[in-house]
Amino acid sequence: MSTLAVSAHTPAFRRPTMPTARCLHHMMRGHLAIRGDLVAATGLSQPTVTRAVTSLVGAGLIHERPDLVRAAGPGRPRIPLEMAPTPWLHIGAAITEDGGTLGFFDTRGRILRETTFPLGTDTPDTAEHLIAGIHRLLSRLAVPVADIGVAATAPHTGFLGERLTEEFGAPVTVGDLTASLAAAELLTTDATTDPILIIHLDRGLTLAVANDNGVTTHPVDSDLGPESLARHLTNADILPGQKRRGFTGLLPAETPQSPELRLLLDERARELGETVARLTQDTGARTVVLAGPGFTVDPDGYRKLAATVNPNVDKRTAIRIIPDAATLARAAARTVALDRLLSDPVAVHAGLVDRNQL
């Protein structure tokens, strides 16, 4: 019987700080490494790296490959290290206005299984859809669950965490979806002095800023949500779609674009561009990622948006759009699924042992 508290963890969403986590993070991004590589990559001392490697080997997260030793002159041979296949998995889910995505990941962050699940009429109903999806995927895999992470756009994270912990007896991490996207960007870099800005437009506009201190999120008071678009469409006598909720319900992919609709959407793209430029200036970001259906619902508006943004931000600023919902959801799910592993990897192994899963 699990002795876990029925509550969810708050994700760290920062670069790894523990020596074991820093070494593992470096190895997750490559293949083979020797201890000297880890010293150079992490800036840690040789003794600290040696202790971290010993702990990671003991936890079954990495192993030595003496068969790959190459002669390199006098002295002790430098034995390559490699991430080991682990007998457990990490579960991540992303819940947006358009639906849920569920993924099973290994310790490298590679996707093992993936599916989608519908949103319920309320938070408890959505939780049951997620739980059913996890059970379906687990029925095909006789592998223990190290932890479960959920990234959500709605403020119902407390109930989700409690329900998932109750059902599966594994540690649960629940966090903000926009923050998880910012953390995903942060974890692809070794160091940065300039902020990374994520602007996510779904049911409302939310921004997350990532830097060396971690990730902070900020709701933005704006009139750019789906309700505003619905109002403009109605006032222009353009009937909004009724198939799905949110932006994609208002403008399904097959929506014919009349001159009146295109004019309305171009004005909206201009307003979006002004907002993106202002937020980029306010945060001093040099990397800006635009995410969510509020941006992708109108790909024909990208040029108008860019024409508004580019003259008003530093030319060195890199701006891109996450092109589709699947890419966004997978990035968020992976990041929150691996948050505990990248905070304290040895503790993940110890937790499985304590729960008699290994």
Language-model-derived ranges and their functions:
Residues 1-64, 74-77, 82-106, 111, ...:
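ATP-binding/phosphotransfer module of carbohydrate and carboxylate kinases, centering on a glycine-rich
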Residues 64-66, 174-178, 323:
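Short loop/edge segments at beta-strand edges and connector loops
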Residues 67-71:
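Short, solvent-exposed loop/turn elements at beta->coil junctions and helix N-caps
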Residues 80, 90-94, 147-149, 195-200, ...:
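Short glycine-aspartate micro-motif
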Residues 113-143:
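N-terminal phosphate-binding loop and adjacent alpha-helix
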Residues 114-116, 122-126, 162-263, 328, ...:
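Glycine/GP-enriched mid-protein hinge/lid loop-to-helix segment characteristic of carbohydrate kinases
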Residues 129-140, 163, 188-189, 271, ...:
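Amphipathic alpha-helical regulatory segments at dimerization interfaces
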Residues 138-162, 282, 286-294:
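Short beta-strand-loop/turn "lid" adjacent to the catalytic site in phosphate-handling enzymes
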